[in-house]
Amino acid sequence: MAKLERKDRKFKFETLQLHVGQEQPDPVTDARAVPIYQTSSYVFRNSQHAADRFGLKDAGNIYGRLTNPTEDVFEKRIAALEGGTAALAVASGAAAITYTIENLAQQGDHIVSAKNIYGGSFNLLEHTLPNYGITTTFVDIFNLEEVENAIQENTKAVYIETLGNPNSDVVDIEAIANIAHKHKIPLVVDNTFATPYLVRPIEYGADVVVHSATKFIGGHGTTIGGVIIEGGKFDWEASGKFPSLTDPNPSYHGISFTKACGPAAFVTKIRAILLRDTGATISPISSFIFLQGLETLSLRVERHVENALKVVEYLNNHPQVERVHHPSVDPDPKQQELYKKYFPNGGGSIFTFEIKGDSKKAQEFIDNLELFSLLANVADVKSLVIHPATTTHSQCTEEELLDQGIKPNTIRLSIGTENIDDIIQDLDEAFKAIQ
């Protein structure tokens, strides 16, 4: 009973989100729920066993900073849901993005990134990484010629988000992947806003997928975490641009990660070196909470999307709204085409609209909402609101804000799973209060 042993059977997403990584009850206790292994370290059977673990000859646990059995289940499950070969959970989404870039680029290297990304990611690429000799060219990701022209000899990756932040623009993952692969570099995709339930970027050519697990994966605004998923198809050796992955690594017994770890080389190197040395480790309890979140991911996302599309329709017809930025109502035919291709079941419960008026009017509207929580998070089951220009993207210059589609009167909504009538009533009363 309760054993997923048939290798000839391919399970669907809703089943995988419940079972992968714990195909049978805990072998020691028979517990059906994944146990929380709250431990810092692990006992080795003997000296040779310890040496084999440290030499990566035995894949078991070494130390809590690197691995944990609860974390392992979470990693296997999210890898399966994204269609990847391996995953690494870390302490935050920011850590996941930082480790991914640092695993690809070193001093003197270059990244090509979309302009329309999360403000924290923009600051990392624009201000922090240049201190370590890694530069970034930001491009209009919808102009494929501009993307390709930005790639240099020292470019190590193209970085995008499935849905741009904060306006939920749909990016053509497949087209960008083709450009990246033409130049023998990987495509990195932040899939936080879409989730693998709506879009699996690896199926469209992405090589590495990152998430802020804090958002839809956790789903309840309780826990900080991030995850990196490896697609397993990029040929690091044929590329010739990533010696730290392909050549003997002096920091780890002269190991070649591609030869030793195959399709898990990318995340294994992060775990063995970057995580070992800098320690942005996820806690066992956080991993457990994210597993709880994954078990209801499809159910929650369905409701998020259902509610969001009704709110988009309401706002799109409201006299006090200048424009709604959501792919379902985007006037650009190309966005409509991409939305149908990548989101056949709908999507985008995090989006923006421009209220008629200025920054003060936008903030006045926000302050009159009661059901919506004003906070710096998204993808909670509770509906959320924020004024990007003065909060999440406040470090950007006016020019950078406009480049990212953010105006003084832009308001970002994250639509929750409350009753849709209550959500719309709250918006309606806030509009009436500022007339």
Can you name each region flagged by the protein language model?
Residues 163, 192-194, 329, 356, ...:
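Active-site beta-loop-alpha junctions enriched in small/polar residues
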Residues 1-3, 126-127, 135, 153, ...:
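PLP-dependent enzyme catalytic core of the Aspartate aminotransferase-like
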Residues 158, 226-228, 324, 351, ...:
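Well-ordered beta-strand positions enriched in small/hydrophobic/aromatic, beta-favoring residues
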Residues 229, 352-354, 414-416:
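Short hydrophobic/aromatic beta-strand micro-patches
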Residues 46-95, 120-127:
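Conserved N-terminal alpha-helix of the aminotransferase class I/II PLP-enzyme fold
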Residues 278-281, 285-287, 292, 296, ...:
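Conserved small-domain helix->loop->beta segment predominantly found in fold-type I
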